[in-house]
Amino acid sequence: MSDLVAGDTQPKRKIDWLALGLFALGGLAAVSLIGTGLSTAIYGGFGFLQQVSSSQGVLSGLNYILAGGLLLVAAFLALLQLMGRSAPRLLAPRSGRKRAPHLLVLALPLIWVAGHTVSQTDAAWLLLPSLHMLAVGFPLLWLIWLAKREFPHIKPLRRWGALGSGLALSPFLAVILEFVAGILFFLAGMLYLSFSPEMLFNLERLFTRLSWGNPSMETLTRILEPFASDAVLAVLFVGFFAVAVPFIEELVKPAAVLLLLRRPITVREGFVLGAISGAGFGLLENLTQGASTEGWAPLVVARLGTTAVHMITAGLTGAALVEARDRQQYGRLIAAYLTAVLLHGLWNAMAVLPVLAELSDAYPRHLVITPWMVLALLGAGSVILIAAINRRLRPVGVAGEPESG
């Protein structure tokens, strides 16, 4: 009887709700992405059999499958956590110094040249997806290494959970909020147009031309020129991408760190997990928005800077979140968030200004070239900042500390 009573009073293991959420939502997102990727890739494959241009469809499909596969790893680790099992050795961190993965970066020029060459051929649908994954994955691995080098180890579940958050949770929240913001900016633009009969006529002409079918780029540029030349519409256009979008995305990107604030977590972990979450956010953009054979190489190179910016901004906010929790002071958190918004906003502004300059002669010609120089400086500066903050937060004389739970 005493044994029975003792057995009944044994404490039950508490449910790890974060792991449960990662397993359920991450698994659902993974299945959705893989399903979308398979259907897109198969459709592209049929296009090839029918001698129709299919490279972009196959590339997009395989990219979705890759993103879904990464989420499956995160969901699998969450399942192991729920079952009380350890992560496989392949995914578990190892102690000791690791060789810097600089060869990954040194291989990039060869990958870019090969990808550019392949993208001009009929074999692009078959060969470009693999080169695209290497061109996106190699710098991502190097940047993550740069953010966490010589730091105490972090459990695989946390690292992969942060990546999964950046791949699924943060983009999902961002899309909802940006949709609402987009409606508000659109309504503001329509309200402004309602006071200008001439602009309303131009808008009607645009809709009429679009209803006829896909216009040529020259025709579309000519129709959009009055809108691009209008100062108020230009401010709304740039304001959405350079103000509203950064405020929203920098709010949701460190979601992984925010969810861990009720658990033991250090400022170093906040920076690394924030950076990894930003890497996931940038990876999803690279895999979806860079899935084109037209201008493949320049687009892939440009999006490397985007990933670095996403990582440094989310890393800054992630570290500041943990510090604010520890000190119960929020001045640095606000400063870090506004700095992240400023960096992201400047990047987006430099990316959209050339669009206006291409559409209208009302803007100086240097707006076509100068922003790209600023983008290059921002991308390089973000990489330097990642390394500098890592060095500043790096513990002295640490060979390997226990993993955080």
Predicted features, each with a name:
Residues 1-405:
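Hydrophobic alpha-helical segments at protein termini of multi-pass membrane proteins
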